[in-house]
A protein has these predicted regions:
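Soluble ligand-binding/transfer domains with enclosed cavities or grooves
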Residues: 2-187
């Protein structure tokens, strides 16, 4: 993959991932509560992803805001069905996530906008995990939300010919009442 026709310059892994976001249309996920969890959130879900591009949201972090002021964001509007283990019926879910490429092209920020754009919650910056390969990414640092730590890994999934099919995003949430693993499978 090159940055423009005729160019031999290869896109950075994080820019490649950012370009893939616009192609996502479907998600499947599972949540597993570990032994220290007090939430009992184990279950399965699936749904559709509507992707849009918007002017960048400005998180309340001044340094981040200045660095990303001119950026555009990719927004995932997710909706579908989730079924808790042991339950006979499912419930509707919907989420709104904002993906934003850092001005230096070295990180991809993820924010959750469950309560709207003005109440966005920054989750983490994903950076390339070069030790594992160019399709592997990891949260730069765990995000602290009250007493809970959120961390993630992301892997681009490819077919035998090397074409991107989507990506797997695995979350780990730990804290005094949480011991959760979320496995999201986003596909084109």
């Amino acid at each position: 993959m090159t940055s423009k026709p005729g160019s031999q310059k290869k896109l950075t892994p994080i820019v490649t991932l950012y370009a893939l976001l616009a192609q996502i249309h479907r998600l499947d996920f599972s949540s597993r509560s570990g032994p220290a969890s007090r939430n009992a959130w184990s279950g399965q879900g699936s749904g559709e992803v509507t992707v849009s591009r918007e002017a960048a949201a400005f998180p309340h972090d001044g340094a981040r805001q200045a660095a990303q002021q001119e950026a555009e964001s990719v927004v995932f509007l997710e909706q579908g069905q989730f079924q808790l283990e042991g339950q006979s019926s499912s419930v509707n879910f919907h989420n709104r996530y904002r993906w934003q490429l850092a001005a230096d092209g070295k990180a991809l920020s993820l924010s959750h906008e469950r309560r709207g754009r003005d109440a966005a919650v920054f989750l983490f910056d994903l950076v390339a995990d070069s030790a594992r390969g160019e399709d592997h990414f990891v949260s730069r640092e765990a995000h602290l939300c009250i007493d809970d730590l959120y961390a993630a890994t992301l892997v681009i999934v490819r077919d035998e010919a090397g074409n991107a099919l989507g990506f797997d995003l695995d979350w780990r949430i730990t804290g005094p009442r949480k011991d959760e693993h979320l496995a999201y499978r986003y596909r084109c």
